[in-house]
């Protein structure tokens, strides 16, 4: 057994409420993802919702992270079993599921990652995740080593946060601050007091159910505040944001 895969160290860290500092990968490039993997982050989101990623771009990025201590987390474009199955088969063990609003939707996400009888994952005997059939106990280990993080980013999701957090198999609750702000009537202003109060409420309810909570916070002051509020896995920036800021600074240094 490949000990870098099983047990799932990121899943264990969430269960232990250990602080995990991460980064967002949106450039869909194996080179930039490899650089992120060398930086020392605990986890990396490879974004399949808002970034131009699919199976063919994600496989090279997973290859680029081989040997990295950073746990790859895929954000799928939608909570759909076939999409999730394909991400499982190419080698993802950690999932961020966007726009979860009910306990039923959370349970469906969990079921999509589990083989029967615990779930509905389709069975392939040879794929990248089981090293093309060379991992003898893959089926026995897989169900126990998948991480499910559900994203709350709507008023309905906030209303159902207790039921969602209590769902068996859900490892963490993640706040989508931009969509949440829009849902609360503050498009483009995640710093609005209403949004901040709601974020703190989501964190508190997740913690009450023993679940880790996380968020994307590219502004340092925001990230530190969320950590103080009890967030345990925080993405503190993105490859796109870092690249844009550094190149703009470089240009400004010589052009202004």
Curated annotation (Swiss-Prot):
Cofactor(s) named in the record: Mg(2+)
Binding site for Mg(2+): 153, 179
An annotated GO BP: D-glucarate catabolic process
Record site feature (Transition state stabilizer), residues: 75
S-S bridge residues: none
Reaction catalyzed: 5-dehydro-4-deoxy-D-glucarate = 2-hydroxy-3-oxopropanoate + pyruvate; 2-dehydro-3-deoxy-D-glucarate = 2-hydroxy-3-oxopropanoate + pyruvate
Keywords: Lyase, Magnesium, Metal-binding
Annotated residues for binding of substrate: 151, 178-179
SUPFAM superfamilies: Phosphoenolpyruvate/pyruvate domain (SSF51621)
Pathway(s): Carbohydrate acid metabolism; galactarate degradation; D-glycerate from galactarate: step 2/3
The keyword Metal-binding is assigned to this record: yes
Membrane spanning residue stretches: none
CC terms in the record's Gene Ontology section: cytoplasm
Cross-referenced Pfam families: HpcH_HpaI
EC number: 4.1.2.20
List of catalytic residues: 50
Cofactor binding annotation: Binds 1 Mg(2+) ion per subunit.
Annotated GO MF terms: 2-dehydro-3-deoxyglucarate aldolase activity; magnesium ion binding
Site (Increases basicity of active site His): 89
Stored NCBIfam families: GarL, PRK10558.1
SUBUNIT field: Homohexamer; trimer of dimers.
Similarity remark: Belongs to the HpcH/HpaI aldolase family. KDGluc aldolase subfamily.
Function: Catalyzes the reversible retro-aldol cleavage of both 5-keto-4-deoxy-D-glucarate and 2-keto-3-deoxy-D-glucarate to pyruvate and tartronic semialdehyde.
Name this protein carries in UniProt: 5-keto-4-deoxy-D-glucarate aldolase
């Amino acid at each position: 057994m490949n000990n870098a895969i099983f047990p799932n160290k990121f899943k264990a860290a969430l269960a232990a409420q250990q602080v995990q500092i991460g980064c967002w990968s949106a450039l869909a490039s194996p080179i930039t993802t490899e650089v992120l993997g060398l930086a020392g982050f605990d986890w990396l989101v490879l974004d399949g919702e808002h970034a131009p990623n699919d199976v063919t771009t994600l496989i090279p990025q997973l290859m680029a992270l081989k040997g990295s201590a950073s746990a790859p987390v895929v954000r799928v474009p939608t909570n759909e079993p076939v999409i999730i199955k394909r991400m499982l088969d190419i080698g993802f063990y950690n999932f961020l599921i966007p726009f979860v609003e009910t306990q039923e939707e959370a349970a469906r996400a969990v079921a999509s990652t589990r083989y029967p009888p615990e779930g509905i994952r389709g069975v392939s005997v040879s794929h990248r995740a089981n090293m093309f059939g060379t991992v003898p106990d893959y089926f026995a280990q897989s169900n126990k080593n998948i991480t499910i993080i559900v994203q709350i980013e709507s008023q309905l999701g906030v209303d159902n946060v207790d039921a969602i957090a209590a769902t068996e198999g859900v490892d963490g609750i993640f706040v989508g601050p931009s969509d949440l702000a829009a849902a609360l009537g503050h498009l483009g202003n995640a710093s609005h007091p209403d949004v901040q109060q709601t974020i703190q409420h989501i964190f508190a309810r997740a913690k009450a159910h023993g679940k880790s909570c996380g968020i994307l916070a590219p502004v340092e002051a925001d990230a530190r505040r969320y950590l103080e509020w009890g967030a345990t896995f925080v993405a503190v920036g993105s490859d796109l944001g870092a690249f844009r800021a550094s190149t703009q600074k470089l240009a400004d240094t010589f052009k202004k």
